[in-house]
């Protein structure tokens, strides 16, 4: 159950992960050969072990190195004692947004609809390959790669996201209506009934 909590002898942190790593099998095998012990089958643990085993002297250096090694679509949130760090994959496959509460607290979510529930104001979406660091100094933006493109997974609009969320400026419900209209234009068949893919894609 996320978030995962990691307690190493020299660091501890929490980790939440949305996505899938395409090189999870090879990374896990390599880490296990180097002595890493995994407590579950989830690929979410891989980033934590890569951070811990990095020889980079700085925490941000360790995180950037680890992020450059994992491949696939992912959004990570890491919680340390004095900061929260969020990161997005180089293609922006998964959405990740920054918001702010009325009291100044900064929040991060994979869906903008969560901000409305807690009374937060949307600030902006993370860009592909971007890292955001949130601490007592405020919000700082950084990146771990320049090899990026925005290629959001179409399933976010079709199925994963709630209809009242916005992804990179596009409302999910509106996107679904437009896709349905385009589908009707391309496939001119008389249908008895048209239904969405339950449950989360119904809007």
What do these predicted ranges mean?
Residues 202-203:
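Carboxylate/His-rich catalytic cores and anion/metal-binding grooves
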Residues 1-128, 133-198:
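Conserved short alpha-helical segments that host acidic/polar catalytic motifs at enzyme active sites
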């Amino acid at each position: 159950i996320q978030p995962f909590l990691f307690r190493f002898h020299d660091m501890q942190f929490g980790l939440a992960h949305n996505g899938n790593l395409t090189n999870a099998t090879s990374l896990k095998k390599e880490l296990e050969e180097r002595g890493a012990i995994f407590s579950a089958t989830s690929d979410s643990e891989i980033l934590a072990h890569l951070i811990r085993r990095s020889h980079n002297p700085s925490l941000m250096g360790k995180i950037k190195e680890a992020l450059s090694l994992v491949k696939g679509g992912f959004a990570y949130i890491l919680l340390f004692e004095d900061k929260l760090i969020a990161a997005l994959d180089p293609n922006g496959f998964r959405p990740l947004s920054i918001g702010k509460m009325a009291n100044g607290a900064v929040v991060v979510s994979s869906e903008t609809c969560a901000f409305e529930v807690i009374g937060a104001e949307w600030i902006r979406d993370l860009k592909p390959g971007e890292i955001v660091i949130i601490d007592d100094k405020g919000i700082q933006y950084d990146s771990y790669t320049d090899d990026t493109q925005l290629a959001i997974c179409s399933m976010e609009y079709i199925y994963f996201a709630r209809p009242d969320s916005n992804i990179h400026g596009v409302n999910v419900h509106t996107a679904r209506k437009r896709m349905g209209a385009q589908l009707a234009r391309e496939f001119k068949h008389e249908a008895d009934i048209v239904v969405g893919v339950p449950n989360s894609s119904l809007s």
